[in-house]
UniProtKB/Swiss-Prot annotation:
InterPro entries: UreD. It comes from the Bacteria. One of its GO terms (cellular component) is cytoplasm. It is found in: Cytoplasm. Pfam families: UreD. It comes from Streptomyces griseus subsp. griseus (strain JCM 4626 / CBS 651.72 / NBRC 13350 / KCC S-0626 / ISP 5235). This is Urease accessory protein UreD 3. UreD, UreF and UreG form a complex that acts as a GTP-hydrolysis-dependent molecular chaperone, activating the urease apoprotein by helping to assemble the nickel containing metallocenter of UreC. The UreE protein probably delivers the nickel. The gene is ureD3. Coiled coil: none annotated. One of its GO terms (molecular function) is nickel cation binding. Required for maturation of urease via the functional incorporation of the urease nickel metallocenter. The keyword Hydrolase does not apply.
């Protein structure tokens, strides 16, 4: 039997230079826990997997709103593993993430890796709406197959709107049923870990960063708006995380300068 679950959270200023969480509701495999934040102004929420999910046929969703002036970090306790499940005829699973960030608000969306296990079929969508003065740090990582196995079928789409205008709309597809060439030299070139880091900040509107390579398999691209996108591929999850962490530190240091 397939699972349908939606987790919801809402962050708002608490009136004491911090952030409150008036809505923090998990469901099914999506458990939400408030955890300690090293930054006083930020609330921190950790997503904890309460059961194996998604399996083919499951419908999962996370909805998060960061209201004007609030600061929120969302991370995860472990990787998400897309699994085939017991029914070979099941529909693809879906996982939808919907994020809204208000004026002067900050969201750090930093989940762990998404692993596409052999035989799984997942459609993942992330939709983000940013107010004109909102700030966003978003990381996505996909690992194509567990150790020693081929990947499942995985389609991801990330759409971001800033001040009501499109900032980014990117769709990626891997594995069985994906358009030809997804594993060719122009796309993954045999790598099995792919990720991206999106940083949106109003300061980039006045001083955009130049496009440049960050290494043999990573690049930074300024977007048509106050944001930059780092994309990277690597042989495994550890190497990918190292590249994205280094890029994150460099970008955050740039904002502090």
């Amino acid at each position: 039997m397939s699972v349908r679950a939606t987790a919801r959270l809402r962050a708002e200023p608490d009136g004491r230079d911090g952030t409150a969480l008036p809505v923090l509701a998990g469901e099914g495999p999506l458990a939400l826990r408030r955890t300690r934040s090293p930054q006083a102004a930020y609330a921190r929420v950790t997503v904890v997997g309460a059961m194996s999910a998604p399996l083919n046929g499951d419908r999962l969703a996370v909805e998060a709103e960061v209201t004007d002036g609030a600061h929120l970090t969302v991370d995860a306790a472990a990787a998400t593993v897309a699994l085939p499940g017991p029914r070979p005829d099941a529909d693809p699973s879906t996982y939808g993430v919907d994020l809204t960030v208000g004026e002067g608000a900050v969201l750090h969306w930093l989940p762990e890796q998404l692993v596409s296990a052999h035989g799984s079929d997942l459609r993942m969508t992330t939709r983000v709406r940013l107010a004109p003065t909102a700030r966003l740090l978003l990381r996505e990582e996909q690992i194509l197959g567990r150790h020693g196995e081929p990947t499942g079928a995985l389609t991801t789409r990330l759409t971001v709107h800033h001040a009501g205008r499109p900032l980014l709309d990117q769709q990626l597809a891997y594995g069985p049923g994906a358009p030809g060439g997804w594993d060719g030299p122009a796309v993954l070139a045999g790598h099995r870990a792919v990720g991206q880091l999106l940083l949106a900040d109003p300061s980039f509107g006045d001083a955009p960063l130049p496009a440049r390579l960050l290494g043999p398999t990573a690049a930074l691209t300024p977007l048509a708006g106050p944001a930059v996108l780092v994309t990277a591929v690597a042989a495994d999850a550890r190497l990918l995380r190292g590249m994205l962490d280094e890029a994150m530190r460099e970008l955050l240091d740039t904002l502090k300068a």
